[in-house]
Amino acid sequence: MQHKLLINGELVSGEGEKQPVYNPATGDVLLEIAEASAEQVDAAVRAADAAFAEWGQTTPKVRAECLLKLADVIEENGQVFAELESRNCGKPLHSAFNDEIPAIVDVFRFFAGAARCLNGLAAGEYLEGHTSMIRRDPLGVVASIAPWNYPLMMAAWKLAPALAAGNCVVLKPSEITPLTALKLAELAKDIFPAGVINVLFGRGKTVGDPLTGHPKVRMVSLTGSIATGEHIISHTAPSIKRTHMELGGKAPVIVFDDADIEAVVEGVRTFGYYNAGQDCTVACRIYAQKGIYDTLVEKLGAAVATLKSGAPDDESTELGPLSSLAHLERVSKAVEEAKATGHIKVITGGEKRKGNGYYYAPTLLAGALQDDAIVQKEVFGPVVSVTLFDNEEQVVNWANDSQYGLASSVWTKDVGRAHRVSARLQYGCTWVNTHFMLVSEMPHGGQKLSGYGKDMSLYGLEDYTVVRHVMVKH
């Protein structure tokens, strides 16, 4: 397994403290990797800053060609990446290979095309004798912090738009799941000029803080927890850096009496438990109208009970383990607190799986109330709650009564209601009669404590640029 850092076009061993990297399906240590030292963090940022002088002036065509080459080598090494992701994250191998690798490749190919379509406003005369032009230019060095739930996917979401816009990047994957990012570094070093992409390894305190606080870093992009986002915003405030935050969610799933119940059950069985629920957009907070509440709970409980947890390399496995022992304990604690309320009923699951690995049973909880912690707080595991509601006004208020604002869905056959409710929901994305679907052409990002800024789409590309005005007197 590739375990070296990429700094200024060279693969080098970390000079800091060694950290274990685990296989969550067994609890065994896969390997130990040395963190980047403070000096190596500084070297990576300075390499990116030096490379920006030339990379920032390249044509969109040149940047697009590099991104397309990177997409091709990821596709060619898809099985290798999927196996690394499966071993390091516990993802079912077939899901990593069939779902995630093609989407990752598409992200790089989309931004390769988008790079050639990013334009400023056409020239115009707004003052006599002067011509004004609007430019969209790269910012410089971007520090990108990727999470542990989709290590390679989130690295792609951050690298592709930043590079397409002409920035240079220092990427720090999570210390829990670094293996695919380090493998990506090995392949990228022969495609991009030295210093354009740098990849480090280490914890937030030892590597993340000196990286995000570095004076030559002009932008920090994070996908992570609210607590981490708060820390980075505070940490970078003295240097007034641009920040781009995707900080989690608690997606409301509003099911009206006229919804197609079979479609809801099929959708939540898939979209509520994908990646063992370790996804900020999962369908985890169901609001079911009183006319279909009992039927939905019964049918969904039966469906969730058929989900198979197992070894990641088993083709029949639908749910792998959680990412770490610490996270398993957090998920377990959240469910135990829900049970202790007395009014929440465990329909299925509700316990750790016996044996090795960090497995938690797919869980459905019914009878949850609006103010319950299981409704208000992100669990980030295979846990879905169901809350009964009376009418449209009530459920819209409840759905919006959340610190999160990332994703939501509405299930109804009434087109007017679908439009009406979607317009009132305070979420970055609202799906109607589906959930969880993402495409490279459409933006992904939240409101409120879910953060700000967009991933994917032309809006995502614009987030990695600065708008400039050039005026010429003639």
UniProtKB/Swiss-Prot annotation:
Pathway it works in: Amine and polyamine degradation; putrescine degradation; 4-aminobutanoate from 4-aminobutanal: step 1/1; Amino-acid degradation
Family matches, as SUPFAM superfamilies: ALDH-like (SSF53720)
Catalytic activity of the protein: 4-aminobutanal + NAD(+) + H2O = 4-aminobutanoate + NADH + 2 H(+); 5-aminopentanal + NAD(+) + H2O = 5-aminopentanoate + NADH + 2 H(+)
PANTHER family: ALDEHYDE DEHYDROGENASE-RELATED (PTHR11699)
Keywords attached to this entry: NAD, Oxidoreductase
Subunit structure: Homotetramer.
Annotated binding of NAD(+), by residue: 146-148, 172-175, 209, 225-228, 280
Pfam family, one: Aldedh
Function in brief: Catalyzes the oxidation 4-aminobutanal (gamma-aminobutyraldehyde) to 4-aminobutanoate (gamma-aminobutyrate or GABA). This is the second step in one of two pathways for putrescine degradation, where putrescine is converted into 4-aminobutanoate via 4-aminobutanal. Also functions as a 5-aminopentanal dehydrogenase in a a L-lysine degradation pathway to succinate that proceeds via cadaverine, glutarate and L-2-hydroxyglutarate.
Something else known: 4-aminobutanal can spontaneously cyclize to 1-pyrroline, and 5-aminopentanal to 1-piperideine.
Family from the record: Belongs to the aldehyde dehydrogenase family. Gamma-aminobutyraldehyde dehydrogenase subfamily.
Active-site positions on this chain: 246, 280 (nucleophile)
GO molecular function annotation: aminobutyraldehyde dehydrogenase (NAD+) activity; NAD binding
EC number: 1.2.1.19, 1.2.1.-
Name the record gives this protein: Gamma-aminobutyraldehyde dehydrogenase
Gene giving rise to this polypeptide: patD
